Design a protein with these regions (language model features):
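Hydrophobic residues in alpha-helical membrane-spanning segments
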Residues: 47, 51, 55, 103-104, ...
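Extracytosolic (periplasmic/ER-lumenal) interhelical loops and adjacent juxtamembrane/interface segments
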Residues: 56-60
């Protein structure tokens, strides 16, 4: 039992660290009205391990803080990632194309309002939904599905114990 808890925490911490590093490395395209947050491709990891749900939340929280995001962005952006990751976990046994939808939808519905009210972006909300949505489709949909394809080969070795 203790070994499972250690494995769960270790996987969550590693996923959080990966999210932070990817957010930092790709910072120029990870923030703003038009953004492609490469780290969001990791939101497919709840398909493989439940440890990804808290790991992604903590990673997004730390990534937003270290990226200099405003407090509402830190809070609501991280909640969007948490909701998306939890949704992916709930859909993990469905078609993988459905499993990547929750983070896309969560970010489309939350992030445009953060951009408007935290950063004062004057673009129309529907346009912000479109730009955030395109970035999420690229990161979660395209890159996330590529990650699923690669990880499916090694899932029993990487995620077998959580």
């Amino acid at each position: 039992m203790r070994d499972k808890k250690v494995t769960f925490l270790t996987q969550a911490a590693m996923i959080a660290a990966l999210y932070v590093v990817l957010t930092f490395v790709f910072a120029p395209i990870s923030f703003g009205e038009v953004q492609i947050r490469i780290a969001e491709m990791l939101t497919v990891l709840p398909i493989f391990t439940p440890a990804a749900v808290p790991g992604l939340f903590v990673g997004c929280l730390i990534g937003n803080i270290t990226g200099g995001a405003m407090l509402p962005d830190v809070i609501f952006g991280s909640i969007a990632t948490l909701v998306g990751a939890a949704g992916t976990y709930c859909l993990r046994n469905t078609n993988r194309f459905f499993a990547v939808l929750p983070p896309i939808v969560a970010n489309i519905l939350i992030v445009p309002f953060v951009l408007r009210y935290a950063y004062g972006v004057v673009l129309p909300i529907p346009f912000l939904m479109l730009t955030v949505g395109i970035g999420e489709v690229v990161s979660c949909g395209v890159l996330g599905n590529c990650l699923i394809t690669v990880l499916n080969r090694y899932k029993t070795r990487i995620f077998s114990r959580a």
